[in-house]
C-alpha cells in the first residue's frame, strides 16, 4: 500500500515538473511568435508601398553591394562587429575581477558571442545563456555574472542616450522630422494627460506603500527570497563598477563598443556607391543617425527583423535617398550582422565544447596516472 502511494506521489511530481516545463516552453514559443510576427509585419510594411520597379531595383542594389569591391567593406563590417563582441567580453572580465572571479578573455568572448546567437532565436535568452556558460566553465555564480550583465545594459542605455543626444544636436532638423510627422511626442503626452496621469501616479504610490507595510510577510515567500538573492547579486554587480581595478580601461572599452557600432555601419555604406556619391561627406552624419534610430529596431522586433531596415530607410529618406536604396542598405547591413553572429556564435559553441571535452579528458588521464 505504501509502495503504491509513493508511486502515485512520484507520478504527480513528475507530472508537475512536466507541466512546469511545458508552461515555460509555451511562454517562450508565444514570445517568439509575437516578436517574429512583428518582424514580418515590418517587412510587409517596408515593401508594401514599393512599385514592382522599386522592388526590382531594391534587389539589384542589394546584390550589387556584394559585387566588385563591395564585399570587402561588408567583410570589414563583420570584422568590426567581432571586435565589438571581444570588447564586450573584455569589459565583462574587468567587471568580475572585484568579486574575485578571474575569467579568461577567450571564454568571456565566446559567452558573449553565443549570447548574441541565442538572441537571434529567442528574445533575452542570450543574457541567460551567457551567464550559464560562465557558471559552467568559469565557476562564476549565475547571480553575480547576471548582475554585471544588467550593469552593462544600464551603461549601454546611458551611452546610447548620449549618442542619441549627440545625433540630435548634429542632425536635429532631419531627425526631429521622424517624430514630428508621426506625432510620437503628442501621443505620449496625450496618454499621460488629464486624469490618467494622476491615476498612474496614485497607483504607483499605493503599490509602494503596500509593499512597505507588508514587507515582513512578503519576505516569507520562497520566491521572494529567491528574488532577493538575485537582486543582491545585481547590486553587487552594480557596485563592481566603482571597485574595478582598471577604471580607465573600463571606460575605454564601453565607449569603444559604440564606436565599433558606428564604424560597422559607416564602413558598410561604401558597398553602396550611389549612397556615397550622393551624400558625400554627409554619409558620416547619416551613419550616426542610422545607428541611433536603427537601434530601436532591435527593441521592437526579433533580431531587428524588418524593423531595422525600415528605420534605416526612413532615416536615409531624410537625406534624399529613395526607398529602394535605403531599404537595400538596411537589409544588407542587417543580413551581414546577423550572418556574422550566426556563424561566429556556432563556432564559439564548437570551440568551448571541444575545449571543455579536452580539459575533462586530460583531468581523467591525470587522475588515472
Model-based region annotation:
Residues 3-113, 178-295, 340-369:
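Predominantly cytoplasmic-facing regulatory/coupling regions of multi-pass membrane proteins
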Residues 105-107, 127, 140-151, 322-332:
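Membrane-interface alpha-helices at helix entry/exit sites of multi-pass transporters
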Residues 109-136:
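Hydrophobic, aromatic-rich membrane-embedded alpha-helical segments
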Residues 300, 310-369:
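C-terminal transmembrane helix pair
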Amino acid at each position: 500500500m505504501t509502495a503504491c502511494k509513493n508511486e502515485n506521489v512520484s507520478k504527480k511530481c513528475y507530472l508537475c515538473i512536466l507541466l512546469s516545463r511545458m508552461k515555460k516552453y509555451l511562454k517562450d514559443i508565444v514570445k517568439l511568435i509575437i516578436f517574429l510576427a512583428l518582424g514580418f509585419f515590418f517587412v510587409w510594411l517596408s515593401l508594401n508601398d514599393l512599385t514592382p520597379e522599386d522592388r526590382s531595383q531594391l534587389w539589384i542594389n542589394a546584390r550589387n553591394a556584394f559585387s566588385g569591391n563591395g564585399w570587402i567593406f561588408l567583410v570589414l563590417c563583420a570584422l568590426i562587429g567581432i571586435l565589438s563582441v571581444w570588447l564586450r567580453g573584455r569589459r565583462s572580465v574587468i567587471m568580475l575581477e572585484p568579486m574575485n572571479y578571474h575569467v579568461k578573455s577567450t571564454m568571456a568572448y565566446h559567452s558573449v558571442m553565443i549570447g548574441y546567437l541565442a538572441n537571434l532565436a529567442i528574445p533575452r535568452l542570450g543574457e541567460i545563456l551567457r551567464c550559464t556558460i560562465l557558471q559552467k566553465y568559469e565557476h562564476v555564480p549565475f547571480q553575480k555574472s547576471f548582475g554585471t550583465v544588467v550593469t552593462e545594459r544600464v551603461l549601454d542605455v546611458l551611452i546610447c542616450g548620449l549618442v542619441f543626444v549627440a545625433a540630435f544636436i548634429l542632425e536635429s532638423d532631419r531627425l526631429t522630422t521622424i517624430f514630428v510627422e508621426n506625432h510620437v511626442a503628442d501621443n505620449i503626452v496625450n496618454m499621460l494627460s488629464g486624469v490618467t496621469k494622476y491615476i498612474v501616479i496614485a497607483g504607483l504610490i499605493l503599490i509602494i506603500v503596500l509593499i512597505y507595510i507588508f514587507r515582513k510577510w512578503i519576505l516569507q515567500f520562497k520566491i521572494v527570497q529567491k528574488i532577493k538573492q538575485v537582486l543582491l547579486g545585481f547590486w553587487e554587480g552594480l557596485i563592481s563598477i566603482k571597485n574595478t581595478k582598471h577604471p580607465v580601461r573600463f571606460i575605454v572599452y564601453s565607449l569603444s563598443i559604440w564606436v565599433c557600432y558606428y564604424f560597422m555601419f559607416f564602413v558598410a555604406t561604401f558597398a553602396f556607391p550611389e549612397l556615397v556619391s550622393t551624400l558625400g561627406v554627409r554619409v558620416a552624419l547619416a551613419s550616426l543617425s542610422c545607428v541611433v534610430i536603427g537601434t530601436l529596431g532591435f527593441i521592437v522586433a526579433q533580431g531587428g527583423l524588418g524593423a531595422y531596415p525600415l528605420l534605416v530607410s526612413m532615416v536615409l529618406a531624410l537625406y534624399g535617398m529613395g526607398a529602394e536604396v535605403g531599404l537595400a542598405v538596411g537589409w544588407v547591413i542587417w543580413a551581414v550582422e546577423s550572418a556574422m553572429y550566426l556563424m561566429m556564435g556556432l563556432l564559439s559553441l564548437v570551440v568551448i565544447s571541444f575545449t571543455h571535452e579536452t580539459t575533462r579528458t586530460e583531468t581523467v588521464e591525470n587522475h588515472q596516472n
